[in-house]
Structures are given as C-alpha cells and as structure tokens.
Design a protein with these regions (language model features):
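Nucleic-acid substrate recognition interfaces
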Residues: 1-340
Length: 340
C-alpha cells in the first residue's frame, strides 16, 4: 500500500486511492485472514498521510522495521464476530481463545473493536474498544489542593511534606537484567538459544514495566481520592532525559505516565490538574517570604533563606507550585484548607 501510494505521488503528485479488494485479487492469501484487518491497515495509512500533510512534524509514513516489527492488527465488531464470554474471546478467523481478563466490562458498554498484538516477550495481548455513555461530571467544590514537585529520587514530593518513596523498579532489577543480557551476548545470533534468551530478557523488561504501571496507578488513585486540585510543573522531560546524570532516573520514574494517569482520574471525578510554567522559579523562591535565591545550586538539597526559613528544597518548591497553580487558575481556598 505505502509503496504504491509513494510511487504514485512522486510521479503524478496525486494521492492514490485503492480498496482492499484490489490487493486480495493480486494476493489471494490475504483472503485467509480477517478482512477487516486489511481495511484497518489501509485506514491507519490514510490517517498517517493526513497527519503528515496537516503537520510535517509527524513525519512521512514509513515501512515497518524488519528488525523490530510491530506484530499487531486491529479489527471491528460486526454482526457478533467478536464475543467475550466465560473467560474466552472469539475473534474473526481465529475462533474462541482462552484469555486472562483483568477487569469486568460494564453492562451498558457496546463492543466496537479489538486490537491484538504480540509483545517482545512472546505473549499476546488484546485491547477491546467499548463505547459507553458517560454522564457529565459536575465540577466539585474545591476544598483540598496540593502541589507536586518532580523528584529524581522520590518521583515526587508534595506540598504537605510527603515523599512518594518510589521503589525504582528498573534499578532494583539491573543486576538480574545484566546477567540475562550477558547470557544473550554469548548466544549465536539467530539461533534457537538466542531467540529463547531474547524472550527472557524481554520478560524482565515487561515485568519492570508492569510493576511501574501498577505503582503509578495506585499512587495517582490515592491523590485523586484525597485532593480536588493538583498542581504540577510542565516539565521538558525529553531534554531532562538527555542529560548524562538524569536519563536513567527520568525513564525509571515514569513521571509523564504518572501525570497522564492523574489527569484522566481527576477529570472523571470533576477535579482539576493544573500545570504551571516550567520556567517558574519554584525551587529558588522562598515559600515563607517570597524572596528569590538566584544563586541556588542543584547540589543544595536544603533551602536556606535569610528570613529564617530552613526546609527540604523539594518541599519548598512543591508549596510554591501549589500557590502558583491556585493563582493562575483563579481559585481561592480558605487558609486552613491550603496545602502549606
């Protein structure tokens, strides 16, 4: 599909429009698989083209990598071709398959489609797309507010002085991962032993990712249950991860994933996540007198001010983030309800 569209555009400057039926006539083996999988592949390509011409920063559509191919496909629910019943899933052309279902489906949910993929560890996962009628959530009376300051060591420190105490799953598994990778390096590339060991390495990475995701879900749920407004900094994580000393910690913490979880959880309950400007001097500003300490160095973990304020650097920043978030959102809280 992509090769023909690319060739047509280079020769004529026009976009080639063809249907999956053309490819089935040319390649009869395509009839052996789910017909909707081919339709969705074409739709995804069309979306990629539209995104590129709308905004070139998306990049021109590319072929899948032979080295690291994405083994997945998407299909749609039509006339009951996808069914979920008694721990089994029915897929077009695949029949009934036993699955491990991780959550219950709402009774009013309508099944729209499914995406099946094989991860690097050799396990298959399916994501089911459901349509649900969501009732509009009324904006709650905001009574509790908190500021979160990103911390390399802790994940975050809040304006009440709580340190998250992130377990650092990747660093804790580094020795085990290094041992598995050394064993992989001793295998002949492409051999059965190499492929088997490759899956073992991938499973360690998958386990770490699942541990991190589970922790971030639980931590974001705790914050959502207790606070009505959460204030954070709009950090440039891409630049931070490129730093020599910060890269591993930034990737291990999963701050971006954590803030995404926070945002959708808060919105579902009519609460609010406020992002303040990344250039706001939260760390350099004294939370007591408001004076800015321009010569504050990264190595200084305790904030000392001439007014007598002495406190943890991240706690001081979190208090300032909370206050700035309330200011830009135009929300006024009673003094007893502020996180200070």
């Amino acid at each position: 599909m992509l090769a023909e569209k690319k060739e047509c555009y280079e020769k004529t400057g026009k976009n080639l429009k063809v249907t999956p039926a053309k490819y089935k006539a040319e390649f009869p083996w395509l009839k052996e698989v789910d017909s909707l999988a081919l339709c969705n592949a074409q739709r995804h390509l069309q979306i990629a083209y539209k995104n590129f011409f709308r905004d070139p920063s998306f990049g021109f559509p590319r072929f899948k990598s032979k080295k690291n191919p994405v083994k997945s496909y998407t299909t749609n629910s039509v006339n009951g071709n996808i069914l979920l019943k008694d721990g089994k899933l029915k897929l077009p052309k695949a029949g009934w398959i036993r699955i491990r279902q991780h959550r219950k489906i709402r009774e009013d949910a309508c099944l729209k489609g499914a995406s099946v993929c094989m991860e690097a560890d050799g396990r298959y996962y399916v994501s089911l797309l459901y349509f649900c009628e969501e009732k509009p959530v009324e904006i709650r009376n905001i009574r509790q507010a908190v500021g979160l300051d990103f911390s390399m060591k802790e994940l975050y420190v809040d304006s009440n002085g709580k340190h998250a105490g992130y377990p650092h799953y990747f660093r804790n598994s580094e020795e085990k991962l290094a041992k598995a990778q050394r064993k992989l390096s001793h295998c002949r590339k492409g051999s059965n032993r190499y492929k088997k060991q490759q899956k073992k390495v991938a499973r360690i990475h998958t386990h770490i990712a699942h541990q991190r995701k589970d922790y971030l879900h639980k931590e974001s749920r705790k914050i959502t249950n207790f606070y009505d407004i959460v204030c954070i900094e709009d950090l440039d994580l891409k630049t931070m991860s490129g730093e020599h000393h910060f890269g591993k910690s930034v990737h291990d913490n999963g701050w971006r994933m954590f803030t995404d979880f926070l945002q959708y959880k808060l919105e579902r309950e009519g609460k609010k996540l406020v992002r303040i400007d990344r250039w706001y001097p939260s760390s350099r500003t004294c939370s007591c007198c408001g004076k800015i300490k321009h010569d504050l160095k990264l190595e200084e973990r305790v904030y000392l001010c001439n007014c007598g304020n002495r406190m943890d650097r991240d706690e001081n920043a979190a208090i300032n983030i909370c206050r700035e978030g309330l200011r830009i959102s135009g929300i006024i809280l009673e003094k007893s309800e502020k996180a200070s």
